[in-house]
């Protein structure tokens, strides 16, 4: 564990050649994304009028999106609110444009057979960067998958995701070998996965074809919200990587590796987010070009923010923290201004069922425990305390709530603590385990731990 203030004075930034200490930093090659530029000016009023009259204006909106640099800070709750907001209207049309680009569906007559027509719904979300700044308005059209019928609308649904332990091991390996990790995001990833079943969905709210109001869309590829969508996307991406020469991991099916003339490239996937890296930058460029050719991608120069983790890559190692996530947790539970304490739990703390104690809201208690358990991914110092409090989620009492608040007060004291993977450390797999003997006062079970 290490504080952020104790990190090296400069980040290994490929675009910075001078640092404050006066030394010259050698510029290194890195991945960059080249975004297409669209010329021309667009009349917004004409676009809005065209949409209200049911005319197709995808091309005009595409041009307009290229020039519109502002985003809305308010997430609409209803489709009607989004349709009168230019920013969200553009985001909705971008989503439909991606449907057309990926050939996701076809407008057809409503089936007369016993096929199920699944409803659709708009979801609106502001996308933020690692500092919490809104950078994009994202509108997602999803299928109401809860109405799907097993055996009729879907079959296999399971799709693996990367374990957080695997991601941490990848970070440690990259730090040990001194190479930079990069991140890719596949835009509208599920829309790339071919469907095996015959599935129909209703027309999206606010974008109904006025000439064919009774028509529905027949899906050729998966739609967000469908139960089989994650599986369809994973199978499609897996096939692409295997055809490209990658080998899937035996223990972790989301880790793919490829050797090319003695060089190694690693690729870790988490649904539509992809982490990859190699000591050979040209191998990374080749892989990035291959992905961009086959999928619509957004590409970062290096890995900085992933699944709520803030990742800083230095020449001396890699620092992993969840400072932003922690800040959100403290604000959510009203503990931002709480008085700090120096330990996550007082020594010799004993928690019991406390059946005669004052009951506490179970939903809120479980929410607090769930939030803290995810924070443990970069804060092993609170793992024992959180797990002890997690035993009483079925019937929490005020005494248990007080113990959780003590953990939050400790986090107020250590907001920037995280995991540091130094380059000069040994990359050996070492296991530790320990246990007490019947130490639990409630059921006399032993407490064990391992890492």
Q: Over which residues does each language-model region extend?
A:
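Conserved catalytic palm subdomain of right-hand nucleotidyl-transferase polymerases, strongest
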Residues: 128, 132-137, 141, 174-189, ...
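Divalent metal-binding acidic/histidine catalytic loops
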Residues: 136, 141, 154-158, 162, ...
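Reverse-transcriptase-like RNA-dependent polymerase core
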Residues: 45-76, 125-152, 161, 187-217, ...
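Mobile genetic element proteins and their domesticated derivatives, centered on retroelements
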Residues: 41, 47-48, 79, 92-95, ...
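Conserved beta-strand/loop block within the catalytic cores
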Residues: 90-162, 168, 189-191, 249-270, ...
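Retroelement integrase C-terminal DNA-binding domain
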Residues: 1-97, 159, 328-343, 349
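A common structural junction motif
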Residues: 245, 292-299
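Catalytic palm active-site di-aspartate
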Residues: 185-188, 218-226, 248-278, 291, ...
């Amino acid at each position: 564990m290490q504080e952020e203030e104790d990190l090296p004075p400069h980040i290994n930034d490929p675009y910075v050649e001078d640092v404050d200490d006066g030394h010259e930093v050698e510029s290194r090659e890195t991945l960059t994304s080249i975004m297409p530029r669209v010329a021309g000016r667009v009349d917004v009023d004409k676009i809005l009028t065209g949409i209200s009259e049911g005319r197709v204006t995808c091309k005009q909106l595409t041009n307009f999106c290229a020039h519109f640099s502002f985003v809305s800070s308010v997430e609409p709750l209803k489709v009607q609110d989004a349709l009168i907001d230019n920013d969200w209207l553009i985001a909705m049309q971008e989503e439909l444009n991606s449907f057309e680009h990926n050939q996701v569906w076809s407008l057809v007559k409503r089936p007369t057979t016993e096929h199920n027509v699944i409803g659709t719904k708009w979801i609106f979300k502001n996308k933020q960067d690692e500092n919490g700044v809104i950078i994009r308005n994202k509108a997602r059209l999803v299928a109401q998958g809860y109405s799907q019928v097993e055996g009729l609308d879907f079959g296999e649904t399971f799709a693996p995701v990367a374990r957080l332990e695997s991601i941490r091991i990848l970070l440690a390996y990259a730090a040990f070998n001194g190479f930079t990790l990069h991140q890719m995001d596949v835009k509208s990833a599920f829309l790339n996965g071919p469907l095996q079943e015959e599935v129909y969905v209703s027309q999206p709210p606010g974008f109904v074809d006025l000439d064919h109001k009774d028509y529905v869309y027949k899906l050729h590829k998966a739609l967000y919200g469908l139960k089989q969508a994650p599986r369809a996307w994973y199978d499609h991406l897996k096939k692409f990587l295997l055809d490209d020469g990658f080998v899937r991991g035996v223990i972790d099916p989301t880790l793919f590796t490829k050797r090319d003339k003695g060089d190694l490239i690693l690729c870790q996937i988490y649904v539509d987010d992809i982490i990859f890296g190699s000591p050979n930058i040209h191998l990374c460029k080749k892989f990035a070009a291959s992905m961009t050719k086959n999928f619509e991608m957004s590409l970062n120069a290096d890995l900085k923010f992933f699944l709520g983790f803030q990742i800083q890559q230095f020449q001396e190692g890699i620092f992993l923290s969840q400072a932003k996530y922690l800040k959100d947790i403290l604000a959510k539970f009203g503990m931002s201004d709480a008085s700090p304490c120096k330990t996550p739990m007082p020594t010799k703390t004993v928690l019991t069922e406390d059946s005669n104690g004052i009951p506490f809201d179970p939903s809120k208690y479980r929410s607090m425990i769930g939030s803290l358990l995810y924070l443990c991914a970069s804060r092993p110092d609170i793992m024992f305390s959180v797990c002890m409090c997690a035993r009483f989620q079925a019937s929490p009492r005020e005494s248990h709530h007080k113990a959780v608040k003590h953990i939050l007060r400790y986090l107020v004291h250590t907001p920037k603590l995280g995991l540091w993977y130094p380059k000069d450390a040994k990359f050996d797999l070492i296991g530790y385990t320990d246990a007490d003997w019947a130490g639990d006062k409630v059921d006399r079970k032993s407490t064990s731990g391992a890492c």
